[in-house]
Amino acid sequence: MVEKRVQPLARDAMAYVLAGGRGSRLKELTDRRAKPAVYFGGKARIIDFALSNALNSGIRRIGVATQYKAHSLIRHMQRGWNFFRPERNESFDILPASQRVSETQWYEGTADAVYQNIDIIEDYGVEYMVILAGDHVYKMDYEWMLQQHVDSGADVTIGCLEVPRMEAVGFGVMHVNEKDEIIAFVEKPADPPPIPDKPDFALASMGIYVFHTKFLLDALRRDAADPNSSRDFGKDIIPYIVKNGKAVAHRFAKSCVRSDFEHEPYWRDVGTIDAYWQANIDLTAIVPELDIYDKSWPIWTYAEITPPAKFVHDDEDRRGSATSSVVSGDCIISGASLNNSLLFTGVRANSFSKLEGAVILPNVKIGRRAQLKNVVIDHGVVIPEGLVVGEDPKLDAKRFRRTESGICLITQPMIDKLDI
């Protein structure tokens, strides 16, 4: 791997995070919050991964565009990301849709969410722009991508995943030559074009783009003047550059931050209940593919002050215990047993209850003798005594949001409707 420059390019870059999406496939989890604000990994929010990657990469100027039900997201960032100092040439701006360009226009697409804040971007005076999605879980050093962008002379450099060809049908796919120059960009192709050196794989877009700032702003102004544009990077900006300029693919494996290089590069969309559950449960592995314990690349977040977790009772049938599980601060496991589960802060699990494959969001209370298997329980839910989930698929589907693979999402309104 080529060594980094003495003067990191990230110091002259701005990270612009697109965080306005709802994430409708997460169903009730995003009824009250945008997808980037959804809890993840015991104490963080999904957006913390993109923000932490930017900070750890050396980027000190960050803007976050918000729109859908942004209160929870904005409050989180105000609490957890308020340590940037202007006197050190650092800045962190939250950019809600505020009709800056038109008095009647909200963000119409991903490109428009950047275009409407062009004046703010120009004030930053940076050489490079790193456009990020705020709703993916991964660890990446953007400096490597910036270096490839400069060295290749590209107009845009696009972060890409190597995925099996038949799994790439749901992505925007790059058709590249031997130099990873993008020949064509195909949205959700039935027959994804293969990678030249790996014919069984395709290059799928991660929604990460690097531009020289001037080139990006010119492209956004041109796109805004096109009445037929949908104002979207993937649908409009990128295809135009591929056709009329130079676009280069950056392979995620080159910049993925990993503690164990025997693991495949870890990137997850977590856009469905199944994917969200699995990515959280992944963290309970002995050596998880996503290492949140790596102090050299921390996931920064709001550091809520909590007392330690506590496990009480040690009778034969009433023992507070946890195996292969992640248990956050302020949890009290009172005579309950957990296995292969992840608990956020403030969870109370009462006597004789059993949790298996459970992702429990903050401040949930679990009543005595509850039996919960393969569940995601939303913030603040009170689980009644004796509730059984994960044994009767038909009953679960009637009561809760049950996926085809058997994961049940449980919210308080669902509990309130139970006749038990």
Swiss-Prot record:
Residues binding alpha-D-glucose 1-phosphate, per UniProt: Y107, G172, E187, K188, S205
Q: Keywords on this record?
A: ATP-binding, Carbohydrate metabolism, Glycogen biosynthesis, Glycogen metabolism, Nucleotide-binding, Nucleotidyltransferase, Transferase
What catalytic activity does the UniProt entry give for this protein? alpha-D-glucose 1-phosphate + ATP + H(+) = ADP-alpha-D-glucose + diphosphate
**MF terms per GO, please?**
ATP binding; glucose-1-phosphate adenylyltransferase activity
EC main class here is transferase
**What's a BP term from Gene Ontology annotated to this protein?**
glycogen biosynthetic process
Q: Which Gene3D superfamilies match?
A: Hexapeptide repeat proteins, Spore Coat Polysaccharide Biosynthesis Protein SpsA, Chain A
Origin, by domain of life?
Bacteria
Which InterPro entries did the record assign?
ADP-Glc_PPase, ADP_Glu_pyroP_CS, GlgC_bac, GlmU/GlgC-like_hexapep, NTP_transferase_dom, Nucleotide-diphossugar_trans, Trimer_LpxA-like_sf
The UniProt entry, under HAMAP family, shows: GlgC
Q: Which family does it belong to?
A: Belongs to the bacterial/plant glucose-1-phosphate adenylyltransferase family.
This chain belongs to which protein, by name? Glucose-1-phosphate adenylyltransferase
